[in-house]
Amino acid sequence: MRYTIGLSAHKESTMQSHELNTRIISRGKEFFAAIAGEKPSLFDKGAWMGKVMDWCMQNDQFKIRMFRFVDVFPSLTTSRLLTEHVREYFGKEQEMPAFMATGAKMAGMLGSLGGAVLNRLLTSNIEEMARQFIIGENTREAVKNLERQRRDGFAAVVDVLGEATLSEEEAESYTTTYLELLEALKQEQASWHGLPGSGGDPDLDWGHAPKVNVAVKPTALFCLANPQDFEGSVTAILDRLRRIFLKVRELNGFLCIDMESYRHKEITLEVFRRLKLEHPDYPSLGIALQAYLRDTDRDLDSLLVWAEQHGVQISIRLVKGAYWDFETVRARQNGWEIPVWTIKAESDAAFERQARKILEHHRICHFACASHNIRTVSAVLELAKALQVPEERYEFQVLYGMAEPVRKGILRVAGRIRLYSPYGSMVPGMGYLVRRLLENTANESFLRRSFAGDAGIEQLLEDPVVTAERERAARAARPKKERTGPGGLSPFRNEAMVDFTRLGHRDAFPAHIARVRSLLGRTYPLYVGGREVATNDLLPSVNPNRPSEVVGQVCLADTKEVADAIAAARDAFPAWRDTDPRTRAEYLLKAAGAARGRIFELAAWQILEIGKQWDQAYADVAEAIDFLEYYAREMIRLGEPRRIGHSPGELNHYFYEPRGVAAVIAPWNFPLAISMGMVSAAIVTGNSVVFKPSGLTPVIGWQLVELFREAGLPAGVFNYIPGRSSVMGDFLVDHPDISLIAFTGSVETGLRIIERAAKVHPGQANVKRVVAEMGGKNAIIIDDDADLDEAVPHVLMSAFGFQGQKCSACSRIIVLDAVYGRFIERLVAMARATRVGPAEDPGCYLGAVADEQAQQKINDYIALGKREGGVLFESQLPEGEGYFVPMTIIGGIRPEHRIAREEIFGPVLAIMRVNDFDQALQWANSTRFALTGGVFSRSPEHLAKARREFRVGNLYLNRNITGALVERQPFGGAGMSGGGTKAGGPDYLLHFMDPRVTTENTMRRGFAPVEADDDWVE
């Protein structure tokens, strides 16, 4: 009986849904009929912009070049730069529209005069393009255009352009701009008549709505907004947002908190909730939600329940979302679930579903429908009618400069429409402009399909649920790209990065830090031949941020214990060498699984023992897992003998075998990742290992013992022997049974190892091989057209992440003269906003350095830098204990200065000023190191030149230069940075093995078996 009732109710619901959809389609057809023959100005081919849009829709490659050119355009401040970039971006005349071809030709014929003509032409047209979407560059322009809009019957939401500011000065400027705009609107709104509506207060728009309505982007209010520091970000954003809100309230206006990238979604929701509870009786405070996010159904339900519980009125502006490409790419790069719907119709269906939910709760939630989609607008109108929603509880919004026929149509049928009107200068407006251009030229854009495509009205008005189901079915029917890894394993994928948008990840760090802290102070033995070995010589390991806190103490090996470990490894080697490569790989995969299950705990050990920040510590563990997973697959691939040569009558096989006992000497800065990388490479290739961890991170080194023990690795294959380098270092390197040495550390130590390994000792049967990764003096070039919004935070991250204690860290910035002043101003301002303090505090950007010796060395280099150049910035240090040094930026440095040549391994950045890009490359290549480097440029020719001439092992273009990922960015350099090996790359394991060849004569009495790939004479 219950089933029958349920079925009946479902049938009735389906019928109602069908009837509603019929009404939506009918209204949509009426809408299209009312605007027949009209076209948005964007698609008017008689105008410059319309021609450009038409070219973009016809040619994807031109679209990419055009939008990138628009992005770089504000930085092209001279005729020379402009002419060069037109040539670089568009090249041949037949590849560009006529106006550009004419201008380029004129520039070529007339030299600087032609360049000036081209400059004026492009400037005029691109500024016209920007004005299409931006209501004004200053308050006067904005107010004038707002008044014009109101005369046409349109209200407005004003948004100051800018997001993700880089400094507190920029955040304060953004806040001040809002306050000044609001003050100007306060003077003007008194003269504005309320837009006509169905009764109510004539001094309000439509009788019920504030005339002043602004939208604010939270990330513009705090330059270091970051979900890792969730509470600090929320608090800092609110500090400035309150000032804007109080000014809005003074005007009896409306404030909407914009939703930006998914990364900041939870911060934005929390900011809204807190501000609303501070002013529970003020109704004109809202938040934007993005229908294309998979979380939005849940977030909407949560907000509505929260509003009910607290008895407050809220307002929601529902948008589709404008960062689809960014969110998709970022999620894939980091190994996260994609947060957005991947089928356009799914976003449309979600919008209608969420619109219904809001309209059903109109008693507590005002609704702003922000869409140009006629199907969506028709659905909202019909839903509101069916649910008997009062007119004052919902309105419509469209973007300024877009979809003029749609906004006029909405004005006719609903009367309540706002234009979302960005305001500000062209430079921050370029990002917004490019997003709008992408939106309008996308194949799935409703406006393009409606006004510049051939989609029929029935297709445009189809129920998006039906469209999405059809697309999902079509995707399911397509042939799947089956990818398998070596030996039938799944393909290698990097371990997902920590996702601080997830509450579980944010909460995991304090919990695991507390748990690990409860385990501090233990004593750790040696691990030799599968047995724990205690010694009386103990070394305490301390927290560099709190040296009085002992993380643990380890037993130290003397030469006797080292000899015992080498003997255990030597005895284990024959059986391990003969173990099938697949079986050896399985041990690595088991260790990877064990590490994955303890990933937050292992990160917590790094936070406390070596002072890594939360994200840095997690990334170190993830990289260790990557090495295990990747090298396991690589050994399976390399473990199969490969036939070489195809001459009939013989079989030649090429294969590899291990070298013997490997000494692995690890650094402290990546105590799990690099240690695991070198150890796992040696083990999986069939060598047995004697592992010496750094004396600064021996407790983390012990974690390798636990992981391999959990994996069931045979006794003697892995041996753990912490000890003083002065006591055991040379003994380990010189020992005749050592066949291979894997080392990561300083140049001085690396060269000493290479020198000693070259000497043959009595009883030695192998020429020792050294796999050494040493130091770097890495440079980033800032070109004269660089995007400083990108360059500044990436430079800061590259130079000061983990206190600059990475061999890949940036220690030199080479800046072209044309942008020097602007770059330095913004870099110093962002550095000034950071905080120095304990690494376990997520609000601290810079923590303590490794130990007192490192502290003294870095301070000595800072003093040297002050003598060789001039200090541009030096941070304040926290009070109390800890090996802290200031974040320091030193200007006026040249290639001959020691500060530009010697590796410091700390948060000290040298700034070098050059005239042109060629000089920048020359200076970048002027050291004896060749590890990493970077270039920030939007010149295709300069990027190509850097690829050819910037001679480093890892070159990064338009991104930070640290954080190389296994497989994607195999890591290692040449010169004095190393021997050219690439950790995490396809040839790294070869350095741990010797190649062998077997040749068999298959001819017997004149008969030879035929192999499938033999080269026979036809």
Question: Locations of the language-model features?
Answer:
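Conserved C-terminal structural/oligomerization subdomain of aldehyde/semialdehyde dehydrogenase
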Residues: 393-396, 438-448, 545-554, 571, ...
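ALDH superfamily catalytic-core signature
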Residues: 707-712, 734-735, 740, 749-894, ...
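Hydrophobic face of amphipathic alpha-helices that form TPR/SEL1-like repeat modules
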Residues: 443, 452-551
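Short, positively charged and aromatic/hydrophobic N-terminal segments
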Residues: 2-11
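Rossmann-like NAD(P) dinucleotide-binding subdomain of oxidoreductase/dehydrogenase enzymes
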Residues: 607, 637-790, 914, 980
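Positively charged, amphipathic and often flexible ligand-engagement surfaces
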Residues: 12-494
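Residue-level signal for inorganic ion chemistry
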Residues: 530, 548-549, 569, 584, ...
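Glycine-rich loop-to-alpha-helix module at the N-terminal edge of alpha/beta enzyme cores
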Residues: 547-639
